[in-house]
UniProtKB/Swiss-Prot annotation:
GO terms for molecular function: structural molecule activity. Keywords: Cytoplasm, Cytoplasmic vesicle, ER-Golgi transport, Golgi apparatus, Membrane, Protein transport, Repeat, Transport. Disulfide bonds: none annotated. It is found in: Cytoplasm; Golgi apparatus membrane; Cytoplasmic vesicle, COPI-coated vesicle membrane. It is a peripheral membrane protein. This is Coatomer subunit beta. The coatomer is a cytosolic protein complex that binds to dilysine motifs and reversibly associates with Golgi non-clathrin-coated vesicles, which further mediate biosynthetic protein transport from the ER, via the Golgi up to the trans Golgi network. Coatomer complex is required for budding from Golgi membranes, and is essential for the retrograde Golgi-to-ER transport of dilysine-tagged proteins. GO terms for cellular component: COPI vesicle coat; COPII-coated ER to Golgi transport vesicle; cytosol; Golgi membrane. One of its GO terms (biological process) is intracellular protein transport. Pfam families: Adaptin_N, Coatamer_beta_C, Coatomer_b_Cpla. InterPro entries: ARM-like, ARM-type_fold, Clathrin/coatomer_adapt-like_N, Coatomer_bsu_C, COPB1, COPB1_appendage_platform_dom.
Length: 940
């Protein structure tokens, strides 16, 4: 199969035909080589140069220069071989004689190169005289000649089968006598293509010797078996071919094992064969060092598990070792496969393995934290889907919660919250264990989660007492300000030599007379520096963990603590009639809250408390003192907040079910849908394309949508006007990573436009990989050409260019400037969903931000405005729908999308609307690269 590259010809430096002839007549081989290269460029670009043929035969053909010989063969491929009346040129007889001499040359490499050239010839008149010599080459002593000779036989048969009618017999005899691996492979290709029946008979006759062939031959045999089993094999033959494929999965070559196992999976649907093929793929993935190869094979296992997970349930132990892979992608893929195979029979064993891997992943890197999050999510899913394992899972996570980093601990806390909500029986025992871990926690985010859980799910008097004691122990002595002042007073009694005083602080100086009568300067550390050193000593002293977080400026945690204490007091009032104990709790809660406010306004904290936190804490104090007279406070704190979280969990479950339905929806069929049974289809005729369903689905599963006529018309772009000499329009088709332009050219003049070419260029991260060839366009004629542009990222880009036509001289060329084609990045962005915690993590990580101000006079609600933004940017809203509805005057939402290149795009929308005013606000877009952030901002 020939493949050409069009090289742009520089007409300013193109020599004349006479100059080329003179160069060919030169005795210097380098001059001839340069001339031949020029001739090849000119001929490939459309000028046949018929008068140069005889000079090539006279002055180039006799040369022994290897590079010149190579260029000569290229010339024979492209040069015109027929006269205008369709008869063969007489000069080609001389060329044919030269080919025959080269086929009989004593040098085997010249023979082989000539045979390779014959594979590209398509003229039966030239091939016919060479057939006897080609047959002789099949018996040559050198394998290089033989392997090219059998391919030449194949090519000649395809050009005209009457030239070598016994090609199949030749290939069969060649196979019987041949021992070299590559020659056998080529002969198998010839036999399998020309005569499948003889090929099938050869396979069955040499059944026992096939596994001993080399890898390249086995790959050809595997491909043939797939074709013959799907089309023409009977039941007994299928069984024999199935056993052959199964035996090939036990070879030592990785490529053969992979292709054989994949063929078994695609062709033979019985459970035993599928299980065996899957086990061989897993074993192959285990011994392969390349992580990309592991991912490919695990992906095949994942596809098989999606078809029928019952087949692979027994192989789940073979997937578990991949959890220990150093590559996070391999580990994540293994987790995905395991979660697809988990059942009530093996869920406990799987949980144990997950817990072991979670214990081993104690590194501090980002990948280790990602691995912990993935394992935690898997444990979470197991516990939710199989409630009898929830107790074991949550006990393990609670006992190790202090070992997690902030990001992975958030996943653990989300899991614990969901378990508390869905499994009331597990609340009491796990609340106690969770509260006992307070003294070991260090991260403020984990503290917030634990304290929120305590305030929400301590539903008995005993649980409330345990929670109160744990919080008090983690908070330390109250009032906080008084205890810190006392500690500062105690530090004042420490000798100055034991304090770390800042020597860079301003010092007071004085002049002093020494005993010998000279003057000296005496310096003393000021009292301010001494006080600062004592204050730093107080701040650096060891304190309970919750107290440390508050003094370091985490007032969000302080507000959560105030809310939790308020809930505990109100719930105790509902459960108990002990007024004395209730009053004590109320007093202590108010003391803690007021002490937080006071210490937040003192010098003992890193940052002064903000007004929002003060207001939140003061509201909690008012609620504690007023809830008995105003029951609405209890309704808000105890009932409405719980309902809000329950609604959030229910909505999350609903969204997960919708996502699962979207993934597995292709498996659902209607009750009256026709069954496609391959055995009942009519026999496929020869030369008809084979319908390999699995291969086609795997090769073309790119989410392409078949467009109707109206949709196609929307993608037509007019590039030139009707008054231009050449009218031009293009149909823009997006196919995965390529933009395909179907360009229509119409000659509006009464003359022939010669050397017409469409020159395209790009602005942005695009590359023109296939350009339209030059052409001649007759009067009022039209022609369709195609260009392909490769897209590398989702940055804004433009395709522009012009049409050039005219004579060979540059001053005669005429140009039609084309309109630009803007590339719409929305076609490459797909809405997607990620958890809120992952969104926040990515928001912190991404460095590029594009802030766009919004001002709209449209008379629509903020909710409708959000959906308009989602439609324009093709993004998905992560904020729960219940949080967005209503008549509130402001709206804040998080949106997410992912490009087909794997780029993530995050958007935070904040808008407000007055009663009669416009919608105003801003959008913040973040991504890893600047291009996608700027491009999305242009659509807002």
């Amino acid at each position: 199969m020939s493949c050409w590259t069009l090289v742009q010809q520089d007409f300013l430096e193109a020599p004349s035909v006479d100059a080329l002839k003179t160069s060919l007549e030169s005795k210097n081989d380098y001059v001839k080589i340069s001339a031949m290269k020029t001739i090849l460029r000119v001929v490939i670009n459309g000028d046949s140069l018929p008068s140069i043929l005889m000079h090539v035969i006279r002055f180039v053909m006799p040369s022994r220069n290897k590079e010149l010989k190579k260029l000569l063969y290229y010339y024979w491929e492209v040069c015109p071989k027929y006269n205008n009346d369709g008869t063969m040129k007489q000069e080609m007889i001389l060329a044919c004689n030269s080919f025959r001499n080269d086929l009989q040359h004593p040098n085997e490499f010249i023979r082989g190169a000539t045979l390779r050239f014959l594979c590209k010839l398509k003229e039966p008149e030239l091939l016919d005289p060479l057939i006897p010599t080609v047959r002789q080459c099949l018996e040559h002593r050198h394998a290089y000649v033989r392997k090219n000779a059998i391919l030449a036989v194949f090519s000649i048969y395809q050009v005209s089968n009457h030239l070598i009618p016994d090609a199949a017999s030749l290939a069969e005899d060649f196979l019987a006598a041949e021992s070299e691996g590559t020659c056998k492979r080529n002969a198998l290709i010839v036999l399998f293509t020309i005569d499948p029946e003889k090929a099938k008979a050869w396979l069955l006759a040499n059944f026992e010797q096939i596994p001993s062939l080399n890898a390249s031959s086995l790959l050809v045999i595997i491909e043939f078996i797939r074709k013959v089993v799907l089309t023409k094999a009977d039941g007994l033959e299928k069984l024999r071919f199935q056993s052959l494929l199964v035996s090939l999965t036990a070879t030592n070559n990785s490529s053969v094992v992979f292709e054989a196992a994949t063929s078994v999976i695609n062709v033979f649907p019985d459970a035993e064969s599928l299980k065996l093929a899957a086990s061989r793929l897993l074993a192959l993935a285990d011994r392969e060092a390349d992580n990309n190869a592991k991912l490919i094979m695990l992906d095949r296992i994942s596809q098989l598990a999606a078809r029928d997970k019952s087949i692979l349930e027994d192989l789940i132990t073979d997937v578990i070792p991949f959890l220990s892979s150093s590559d996070f992608d391999v580990c994540e893929k293994a987790i995905s496969i395991i979660m697809g195979l988990v059942s009530s029979r093996n869920v406990e064993d799987i949980l144990n393995h997950f817990q072991k891997e979670l214990t081993k992943s104690n590194g501090e890197t980002e990948k280790d934290d990602g691995r912990r999050r993935a394992l935690t999510k898997a444990i979470h899913s197991c516990a939710i889907n199989f409630p009898h394992t929830a107790a074991t899972a949550i006990q393990y996570l609670l006992s190790h919660i202090s070992d997690f980093q902030s990001k992975s601990a958030s996943s653990v806390l989300s899991f614990i919250k969901e378990v508390m909500e869905k499994f009331p029986d597990l609340r009491s025992s796990n609340i106690t264990k969770l509260l006992l871990s307070l003294k070991e926690l260090r991260a403020g985010k984990i503290f917030r989660g634990v304290i929120w859980i305590a305030g929400e799910y301590c539903l008995t008097e005993d649980d409330i007492r345990v929670a109160w004691k744990s919080i008090r122990a983690s908070l330390g002595e109250v009032p906080i300000l008084a205890s810190e002042e006392q500690l500062l007073k105690d530090v004042s009694n420490v000798p100055e030599d034991d304090l770390l005083i800042d020597i860079s602080a301003p010092a007071s100086t004085s002049r002093k007379v020494l005993p010998d009568g000279t003057y000296a300067t005496e310096s003393a550390v000021t009292s301010e520096a001494l006080s600062a050193a004592r204050l730093e000593a107080v701040k650096a002293s060891k304190k309970p963990p919750l107290r440390t977080q508050i003094l370091s400026g985490d007032y969000y945690l302080a507000a959560v603590l105030a809310s939790a204490l308020t809930k505990l007091v109100m719930r105790f009032a509902r459960l108990s009639f002990d007024k004395e104990r209730l009053n004590a709790l109320k007093a202590e809660a108010c003391l803690i809250m007021t002490s937080i406010i006071r210490v937040g306004q003192s010098k003992f904290v890193k940052y002064t408390i903000d007004d929002d936190s003060v207001e939140r804490i003061m509201n909690c104090i008012r609620a504690i003192y007023s809830f008995e007279e105003l029951p609405e406070f209890q309704t808000v704190f105890l009932d409405d907040m719980r309902k809000a979280f329950s609604s959030l969990v229910a909505q999350s479950d609903k969204r997960q079910k919708e996502a699962d339905l979207l993934v597995n929806g292709s498996d659902a069929v209607q009750a009256d849908e026709l069954l496609n049974i391959r055995q009942f289809q009519r026999v496929i005729e020869e030369k008809q394309d084979l319908n390999f369903e699995s291969d086609i689905i795997q090769a073309t599963n790119d989410g392409m949508v078949v467009e109707d006529l109206a949709s196609k018309l929307d993608h037509i772009v007019q590039l030139a006007g009707f008054t231009d000499p050449v009218y031009c329009e293009a149909y823009v088709k997006i196919q995965q990573f390529d933009i395909i332009l179907d360009i229509l050219l119409v000659n509006r003049t009464d003359t022939t436009l010669q050397n017409l070419s469409v020159d395209l260029a790009t602005l942005g991260d695009l590359k023109v990989v296939e350009r339209p060839p030059p052409m001649n366009l007759g009067p009022h004629a039209f022609k369709s050409v195609q260009a392909t542009v490769k897209v590398s990222s989702t940055e804004s880009a433009v395709i522009f260019g012009n049409i050039v036509y005219g004579g060979k001289a540059s001053d005669e060329d005429k140009i039609v400037v084309l309109n630009g084609i803007p590339v719409n990045i929305i076609d490459y962005i797909k809405p997607a969903f990620i958890p809120e915690s992952q969104f926040r993590s990515m928001w912190t990580e991404f460095e590029w931000e594009n802030k766009v101000d919004i001002s709209s006079n449209e008379d629509i609600s903020l909710y409708d405005f959000l959906h308009k933004i989602m439609k324009k940017t093709n993004m998905n809203c992560l904020t729960p729908d219940a949080s967005l509805r209503g008549d509130c005057g402001f709206l804040s939402a998080n949106l997410y999308a992912c490009s087909i290149f794997g780029e993530d795009a995050l958007m935070s929308l904040s808008v407000e609307k007055s009663v009669s005013g416009p919608i105003s606000g801003h959008v913040r877009i973040r991504s890893k690269t600047q291009g996608i952030a700027l491009s999305l901002g242009a659509f807002v």
